[in-house]
A protein has these predicted regions:
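Charge-rich, low-complexity N-terminal segments
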Residues: 78-81, 85, 115
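Basic, often amphipathic N-terminal segments
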Residues: 1-67, 89-148, 164-171
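Glycine-rich beta-strand-turn "strand-cap" elements at beta-sheet edges
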Residues: 74-77, 150-164
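A short, structured active-site edge motif that brings together acidic residues
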Residues: 68-74
Length: 171
């Protein structure tokens, strides 16, 4: 499994992403369920050492505004549909700082390294041939929207557990 460092959004933005997830599930796509939380993944590793949580928490964090923009498609055989997060100076700086804390951990994929990372919120995974058009028809008409990054959390995919690192305690 994977472990990650993620950004969590304000309640209004979460509700908008959840609405889009529900629309995609209604047409039979693999969108996250209500038990999942919309987030922006900053860093991923096969293991993030527990001792690094304190170092992550020492990194300066203040809530900041972002904009969720257009749709992107990652992959070809089983595409992933995502909503782009428009890069901003605070977002890029935070990703660079937090990545530096975990960069020695094992199993870090290249696509989360600074200057390669594409900020996004996942809408649907494992799309089969023919489903991409339906997915786009369902959510492409949604306009860009503003959000606030309220906090940083850690996710442990092995234990299916999350905990706050900084910012909001609302998990």
């Amino acid at each position: 499994m994977v472990q990650s460092v993620e950004l969590v959004l304000d309640v209004t933005a979460e509700a908008e992403v959840r609405r889009q997830w529900a629309l995609l599930r209604e047409i039979g796509l693999h969108a996250p369920g209500p038990e999942h939380r919309p987030h922006i993944t900053l860093a991923v590793a096969s293991e993030i050492w527990p001792r690094l949580d304190k170092a992550l928490a020492r990194q300066e964090f203040r809530p900041f505004p972002i904009r969720l923009g257009g749709l992107l498609v990652f992959g070809a055989r089983t595409p992933i549909l995502v909503r782009a997060v428009v890069p901003s100076a605070p977002l890029i700086a935070l990703q660079h700082r937090l990545f530096r804390v975990i960069e020695e951990c094992p199993g870090i994929p290249a696509n989360v390294r600074p200057d390669i990372w594409t900020p996004h919120v996942t809408l649907a995974r494992r799309l089969r041939p023919g489903q991409l058009e339906a997915a786009l028809d369902t959510v492409a008409w949604d306009k860009d929207f503003r959000a606030t990054v309220e906090g940083v959390r850690r996710w442990d995919g092995d234990r299916r557990d999350e905990w706050p690192i900084s910012g909001t305690e609302r998990l």
